[in-house]
Structures are given as structure tokens and as C-alpha cells.
Amino acid sequence: GLDSSLIAALVNEYHKEHNLPQLETYSIGLEGASDLDYANEVAKYLGTKHTTVVLTEDDFLKAIPEVIASIESYDTTTVRASIGNWLIGKYISEHSEAKVIFNGDGSDELSGGYLYMKCAPDCIEFDRECRRLLTDIHTFDVLRSDKSISSHGLEPRTPFLDRAWVDYYLSIPHKYRYTGDSVIEKHLI
């Protein structure tokens, strides 16, 4: 999506500036998923070494017992949200020398990217909800992502949750961060 594409662009730029090897990017999904097409377009534009991992519903279902063991949770929402990270982590650990994975986690919480947040009555409540989600994020998204990826010997990185970036972004007056009924999600990002 938008979040991981932005991270890929920034990391790719860093690779080029420091003469590092070509950046490897990955996307995962079911056959025909539009996100896979978008990821391929971004990778082509950036010039990364891209791999699309196409899975079946059966692949996702078969992974559930191992995902539960890795994330140490039976919570349905947590398990469902972890399967993709777990499967892509497994694929990368088996097919690449990579040890660090950058992802877009935290962007929705920081920038109000969840659909329900468009219903906030005003920019003050919007800001309050973003801050509430960020306060608790280490107990759900970050922990879930870390466990599902690190279970394959990989190290996840979440640039959108970098303390300096979060502090900077939240210092922008909330009236500029809140779009209300706008169709443009995460317009500042």
C-alpha cells in the first residue's frame, strides 16, 4: 500500500546514495489482488529487485497453527492480521540473505488512516484518537509484527514509529492533519 511504498522509496534512495546492493522488495497476496499489481508498479518505478509471492487461501489457512505459536496468541483479530507478515517473513528467510525488513506499520495510527477516523466530529477528537492508538500500539501492532517476522530470524523495522518522526508529525497542528470528509487518506504522508 501507500505506507510500504513510501518506505520502499526512502530505503531505495538510501541504498542508491550509499552504493548499496539493489533493494529487494516483496509483496504477498492472493491471485488477482490489486495490491500486487500496485506493488509491481512501484517496484518497477523504483528499480528494485521485486518478488511477488502469490498464495492460495489454503496457504493462509495452513499457516494458522504456526502463526498462533509464533505470536503466542489465539486472538482472532491478531492471528488474522499476523498471517501475511508471518508468511512473507518465512518466504524471505528461505529465499534471501536479508536480515532486516522495513514495513509501513504505524502509519494508520499516526495519520488517522482508518476509515472510522473520518467520522471524528472534529480535529481535536481526531488528534485524541491518533494519540490513543499510538500510546497502545506496542501492545498490539508492533508486538504482533515483531513476533510474526522475527520468528523467522528476521528483524522488522517500523520507520513510521520512529520517535523523532512521531514527535515531528504530531507537532503539526491537528487542524492540518485532519481531513474530515476528504477522500484523500493520509494526505500529509
Tell where the protein language model's regions lie, with residue ranges.
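ATP-dependent adenylate-handling active sites, centered on carboxylate activation for C-N bond formation
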Residues: L2-I189
